[in-house]
Amino acid sequence: MATSAPGVPSSAAVREESPGSSWKEGAFERPYVAFDPDLLALNEALCAELLAACHVVGVPPASALDEDVESDVAPAPPRPRGAAREASGGRGPGSARGPPADPTAEGLLDTGPFAAASVDTFALDRPCLVCRTIELYKQAYRLSPQWVADYAFLCAKCLGAPHCAASIFVAAFEFVYVMDHHFLRTKKATLVGSFARFALTINDIHRHFFLHCCFRTDGGVPGRHAQKQPRPTPSPGAAKVQYSNYSFLAQSATRALIGTLASGGDDGAGAGAGGGSGTQPSLTTALMNWKDCARLLDCTEGKRGGGDSCCTRAAARNGEFEAAAGALAQGGEPETWAYADLILLLLAGTPAVWESGPRLRAAADARRAAVSESWEAHRGARMRDAAPRFAQFAEPQPQPDLDLGPLMATVLKHGRGRGRTGGECLLCNLLLVRAYWLAMRRLRASVVRYSENNTSLFDCIVPVVDQLEADPEAQPGDGGRFVSLLRAAGPEAIFKHMFCDPMCAITEMEVDPWVLFGHPRADHRDELQLHKAKLACGNEFEGRVCIALRALIYTFKTYQVFVPKPTALATFVREAGALLRRHSISLLSLEHTLCTYV
């Protein structure tokens, strides 16, 4: 196959329609509404394909790393399947790490080669395959104004959505939907099957729509273009250079965290980020210089005495939405819970969930069955036409590591668990559902108000959840899903999300309910079309918080896995605390969160 860049097929994921299209009849008759849970039911085969794409692929130990793969993640020794839960704290309290794996034992999977191939997506000098796919469609078929409007709607929703596994999965599904909506019937071109052949990966979606945000227009600082006297830049393109430095930090951290999957989540455990063997020198330098990176993308830089910031504006808008939603509580707004079930499907059996139950086990079993079936169904297409970088995983022996679960869909992409928490926050995923966004705000307020005495915030969580469970009127009308998900997360994860973790706190600020939930509905066609046209013509895709806070997040979360030397850790805690205070974000001890949770 001809290539236009090293390892990038010139045809990308563009493919003529297969004889049996998996879209349900009438799937493209409705007007497109981004992040609509009902869309997931229109193509169950695509959902299963994406679930499989969210998994790490293991190969037999004898398989060698493809010579064409260039990566800084060395292949790790094979591990027994199911060992991931025992890494760094185990699946539950008190679990012990087993003896080293016997290379001759049955059932071994080597996930090192796949981790090595996957990290190549996260590099500044590697093309974005989502951008490349769009460009190929543009050259081959031209992009209509209607496509631009739908794509703009998807991009706007991604900017307002939480950075989480559910959002990444939805973005992947809807990117395929938008492309097929406009090109399947007229041009017989489809993206269904592209993830199964590795022409696109879930990491490509994560990078394009969430990590780098290729469509973002504010240079990483919301409102920068609206400033009356914008800060002078030293040279043309300086803003993009500054943003690329952040992107390098975020992508380097992601590469290192993916590297932990090379040995089932245990690689680099205990290694120091300040020179330990668990990280690369480039990452160590980027982490040490995070403050310089953040300073250039900080909306509070140069301001004295705190005051207005991106987060104070976001908090005010959140309050306005909550008040408006309360006033319209009896207005019959339709609520859907498909994303609650999707969250359960993605996170059951992973370190994000620490309390098991029949519903969780059923979700994990359903996911395993769907992934296995989809992997087998696409075996022939994968062997005929796999992307060169992943060619070795198209052979008959490789298979998804069902025990690790869909960790590639998560933001941090590691399987580490500590303090009964995991890298992926279940509660951040819940922010994708309108009723849960509102319920989470009420839940936090109830925890804070529960005791007038000096009872610790942690001790207030379980009684408040108990009260919520006992009062059906106080719950969203979701058949008990919300309370079940809170129980599954556990009090430690709730405590971490609400009061401790800067990633969760900043995600709460990033999620824009006006963008996610405040647009015209599908049955208001004219208003919806006007809304999408304004998004497309305005070309103002601004984030809600400045990228300086994202730089802090990636440094913080990497330091939780690759613990730095004490001096570097103390410096980071001091500088990170100052940045959070300037943005009016109040959290419990960062030292506690760094050392206790993950």
From Swiss-Prot:
Zn(2+) 1 binds at C128, C131, H208, C214. GO terms for cellular component: host cell cytoplasm; host cell nucleus; viral envelope. Residues 425-504 are annotated as: Zinc finger 2. Transmembrane segments: none annotated. InterPro entries: Herpes_env. Residues 310-583 are annotated as: Zinc finger 3. Zn(2+) 2 binds at C425, C428, H497, C504. It is found in: Host cytoplasm; Host nucleus. PROSITE patterns: HERPESVIRUS_UL32. Keywords: Host cytoplasm, Host nucleus, Metal-binding, Zinc, Zinc-finger. Residues 1-23, 66-107 are annotated as: Disordered. Plays a role in efficient localization of neo-synthesized capsids to nuclear replication compartments, thereby controlling cleavage and packaging of virus genomic DNA. Belongs to the herpesviridae UL32 protein family. This is Packaging protein UL32. The lineage of its organism: Viruses, Duplodnaviria, Heunggongvirae, Peploviricota, Herviviricetes.
